[in-house]
Structure formats: C-alpha cells, structure tokens
C-alpha cells in the first residue's frame, strides 16, 4: 500500500475535467487499497459516496478573481501559492510516498517542503499552462504522466521529458446508456421528434460554441428540426447569448445552468447527439468520452487529443476541422437525417470507452508510472 496525495486548490471549489480526473483517480486508487489524500481549497465540493480511504484536507486561499489582473497565469500562480502557504505543513506531516500535481503552477511544491521530506512528486498533465520559470522548477518533478499521446508530445517539447500516457477515464457504470428521458425533454420544451444536440462544459472561447451557433444558422441546418442545448457557465456565456439573438436562433438554442457531475448522465439521456467543436488544443476531452459512454454519437473537432478519444474511422463519431461552421453543419445534418446511424455510432462509442478509457485502467497506468504495484482488484 502506498500513501498518495493529490494537490489541486480547485478540486474542492469547482467542477471541470481536471477536478473530475482527481476525484475519480483518487477513488480508483483507494479501491485498489492505497491510502489517498486530497489537498484542496476551502470549499464543499465532494463526489457522492466518497470512498472511506480518501481523506480530504481543505485550506484557505486567495481566489484568482481577487488577484490583480496582470495576466491569468499570474492570477492562478498567486491563487495556488496562497493555498500552499496554508497547506504545506499539514502536507509535510502526512509523509506521503507520492504527491500528484495537476498544473505547472504547482511546480514549486517540492521546493517549499522541509529539508528531509521524502515525498516524490509526479506531474499529471492535462494541458499546457506553461509559464516563465517552469522549466527550472520542474527539475524536482520525479515522474511525468499525460492525458493523451498528443499531450505527451506537448510536454516533451516544453520540458524534454517523455511522460507515460495514462489517459483519462469515464465512470462507465454511471455514464451508461438509458431509455430516452422524454420527461426531461418536455421540461426543456423539446418535442419528441426534435433532434437535440447538446454540449456540456465551461463556456470559454476555445470550446468553440460560437462555431456551433453559426453552424446551426448555416443553410444546411435551416430546415432541420433540431435544437442545441448548451449546459454550463463561463465568461463567454453573455457573448454566446448575444450571438444567438443576432443569428435569430433564440427558438432553437437553450442555455442551461451548470449541473453537478452526478446528474450529467440523466441529461445525456434526453439528447440525441453531443457536439464539441473545440478550437483549442484539448489534451483529452472527458466530456466527449462521457457522452460516448452514454451511447451518444458525437461530433467533435479534429484537434489536440480529441481524435484519440473519438477515433478516426467515423464508427463512433464525426471529426470536423476546427473553426469550420460549414463542415460542422454538414456533420450535424448527417446525424440529424440518419437515426439508425446515430444508434450505431452510439453503441460503438460506448464499446470503445469501456474497452480503453475507464478510471480503473487509468489508475493502473498511473501506478505503473510511479513504479508501484498495480492491483486491479476492486476494494469495497
């Protein structure tokens, strides 16, 4: 048994891909018999049915929104440094074998611990977030893992280290196919014969939802009985709402507040397909994999690590060039017109995720990267 800690100030205060990865890996490692600790900021976010082998420690921090805006990276570094100032003594007292860092902004952790601390550090990459000085600080990172092959190349280009690829995962028992929820559709005002596309995630520019709105207004989609459900919040939401009005799409686009991660499967049960038109390099795309695990066909951008999730052979979903509203509209029309194809793609996507991308598999790969014994046995 190993003592493993995850350090991420955001994991107890917000939802997102990195936060999901931390909680799910913590759960998989705890079920495998390891002693797990999670160090986050003061906040109440926890997964439902937290495994008893996981201890959560929270500490005060200065939220990035309260830091002078001289750059988002500066704000996030200050946010994490303020958390470390309060958390480091409790962390050092834990005598952990390994600590997992999720952002380069935390690379200073090995440098601020008491002399003689034996904890080794692993960087679990899910993107880039590089900053001046990170190469120097990275010298005390002992192990490197990445969310995809694409992400591994990004990390190697920056730090000249080759990470082990562990991939992210999906809770396939939770994100499972279900009977279409017409009650939820009725609550949303969606007719039974309407093809409902959906996106769930943070509304930031690089997610490309402006492209999805423009695709819906393309000639190929104007005479199709479709609607787009956008679930989430973020700085781009007002801009997207304004674009919806400008394009005359107010009757075809629904904005929904963010939902807890545990309620996402029910939401996917009400939709016909997922649309994820990223215009920035996503390392993996957990939300895409979750939709696929629910047997939903997906349309996503051919960018970053997304093709590793969806596959290139068009059996599980369709890949389109990033920032191409016309190509996205054609793909949406293709799925809207072919319900049988939607079913086939959904079933193939579910099989792909179950075969390649579960959290138990991710945990086994992480343990191997740390040089620890992997035990696939499920521990109650």
Give, region by region, the residue ranges found by the protein language model.
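Short hydrophobic beta-strand element within catalytic cores of glycosyltransferases
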Residues: 297-300
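Conserved donor-binding/catalytic core segment of Leloir-type glycosyltransferases
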Residues: 191-207, 213-216
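Conserved acidic donor-binding segment of nucleotide-sugar-dependent glycosyltransferases
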Residues: 312-325, 334-340
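Carbohydrate-associated surface elements
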Residues: 150, 169
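Short alpha-helical donor nucleotide-sugar binding micro-motif in glycosyltransferases
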Residues: 258-259, 266-271
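N-terminal strand-loop element at the rim of the active site
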Residues: 7-13, 28-75
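A short helix/loop element that forms part of the nucleotide-sugar donor recognition site in Leloir-type
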Residues: 176-190
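Nucleotide-activated donor-binding/catalytic signature segment of Leloir-type glycosyltransferases, i.e.
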Residues: 241-259
């Amino acid at each position: 048994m190993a003592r493993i800690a995850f350090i991420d100030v955001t994991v107890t205060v917000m939802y997102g891909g990195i936060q999901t990865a931390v909680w799910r890996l913590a759960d998989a490692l705890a079920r495998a018999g390891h002693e797990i600790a999670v160090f986050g900021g003061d906040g109440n976010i926890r997964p439902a049915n937290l495994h008893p082998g996981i201890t959560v420690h929270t500490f005060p921090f200065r939220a990035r929104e309260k830091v002078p805006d001289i750059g988002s990276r500066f704000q996030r570094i200050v946010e994490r440094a303020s958390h470390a100032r309060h958390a480091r003594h409790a962390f050092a007292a834990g005598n952990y074998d390994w600590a997992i860092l999720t952002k380069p902004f935390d690379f200073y952790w090995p440098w601020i611990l008491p002399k003689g601390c034996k904890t080794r550090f692993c960087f679990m990459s899910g993107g880039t977030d590089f900053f001046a000085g990170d190469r120097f600080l990275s010298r005390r990172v002992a192990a490197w893992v990445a969310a995809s092959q694409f992400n591994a190349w990004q990390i190697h280009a920056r730090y000249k280290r080759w990470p082990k690829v562990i991939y992210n995962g999906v809770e396939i028992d939770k994100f499972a196919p279900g009977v279409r929820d017409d009650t939820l559709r009725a609550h949303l005002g969606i007719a039974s014969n309407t093809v409902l596309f959906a996106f769930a995630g943070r509304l930031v520019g690089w997610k490309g939802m402006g492209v999805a709105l423009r695709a819906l207004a393309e000639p190929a989609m104007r005479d199709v009985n479709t609607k787009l459900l956008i679930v989430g919040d973020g700085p781009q939401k007002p801009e997207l709402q304004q674009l919806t009005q400008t394009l005359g799409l107010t009757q075809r686009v629904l904005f929904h507040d963010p939902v807890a991660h545990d309620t996402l499967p029910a939401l996917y049960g009400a939709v016909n397909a997922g649309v994820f038109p990223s215009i920035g390099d996503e390392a993996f795309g957990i939300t895409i994999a979750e939709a696929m695990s629910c047997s939903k066909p997906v349309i996503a951008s051919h960018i970053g690590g997304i093709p590793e999730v969806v596959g290139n052979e068009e059996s599980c979903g369709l890949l389109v060039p990033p920032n191409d509203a016309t190509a996205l509209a054609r793909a949406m029309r293709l799925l809207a017109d072919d319900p049988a194809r939607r079913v086939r793609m959904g079933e193939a996507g579910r099989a792909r995720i179950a075969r390649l991308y579960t959290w138990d598999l991710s945990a086994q790969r992480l343990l191997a990267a740390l040089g620890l014994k992997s035990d696939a046995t499920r521990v109650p």
